[in-house]
């Protein structure tokens, strides 16, 4: 189990963003910035955060849509998907990268944290994790099915941390050609890993019957925890 709180992170003149914090029972020395999917910081993201906290990590999950839809949460069903896609259309992506980078710095400054936190994101958060890794210095980047990543490979030389990508071979939202481009771009780069599961988009999301693939989720999560354990032990 963990204890939870909500911190406020200054984001320039725009105001303050909520950063939900999970603290493990034992004093943490490593942290993970967990970046939401389009459905918000809802039951699924909170469950992932708790899983990471049980593993010993301090976890922070920023409220990415705070500038126009604070505390956004949507159902993990077709109606929620449609509503969430509308919210994504309102997102100022560069501003969101700045906000998440500020959250990373805040998490890095918490007591006991010895080195830079990891960034771990799902869907929209997978794209943001990659962008933040290119603009800041996290210890590790784990990106789950970030649909924007194939179009952002030009920033790969800016990413200096070990990076693990997860995609599904049957993802209707991300072309296999884009995933292949990632594989080609990271070939020969130490610490960069591409994992492709036989699954569709958002396969880790246990809250969504239309997306979840239990076998793929378990396999990818085992790889994620091994990757974190190698480069950022709790």
Give the ranges of each region predicted by the language model.
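N-terminal cap/leader regions of alpha/beta-hydrolase-fold enzymes
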Residues: 1-234
């Amino acid at each position: 189990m963990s204890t939870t709180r909500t911190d406020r992170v200054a984001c320039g003149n725009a105001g303050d963003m909520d950063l939900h914090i999970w603290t493990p029972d034992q004093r943490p020395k490593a942290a993970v910035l967990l970046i939401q999917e389009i459905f918000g910081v809802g039951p699924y993201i909170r469950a992932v955060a708790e899983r990471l906290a049980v593993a010993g990590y301090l976890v922070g999950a920023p409220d990415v849509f705070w500038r126009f839809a604070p505390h956004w949460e949507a159902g993990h069903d077709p109606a929620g998907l449609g509503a969430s896609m509308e919210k994504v259309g309102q997102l100022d992506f560069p501003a969101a990268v700045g906000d998440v980078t500020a959250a990373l710095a805040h998490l890095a400054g918490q007591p006991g944290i010895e080195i830079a936190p990891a960034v771990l994101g799902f869907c929209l958060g997978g794209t943001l994790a990659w962008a933040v890794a290119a603009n800041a210095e996290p210890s590790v980047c784990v990106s789950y099915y970030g649909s924007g990543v194939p179009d952002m490979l030009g920033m790969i030389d800016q990413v200096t941390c070990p990076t693990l990508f997860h995609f599904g071979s049957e993802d209707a939202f991300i072309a296999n050609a884009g995933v292949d481009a990632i594989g080609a771009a990271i070939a020969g780069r130490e610490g960069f890993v591409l994992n492709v599961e036989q699954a569709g988009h958002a396969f880790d999301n246990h809250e969504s019957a239309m997306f979840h693939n239990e076998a793929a989720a378990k396999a990818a999560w085992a790889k994620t925890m091994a990757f974190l354990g190698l480069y950022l032990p709790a």
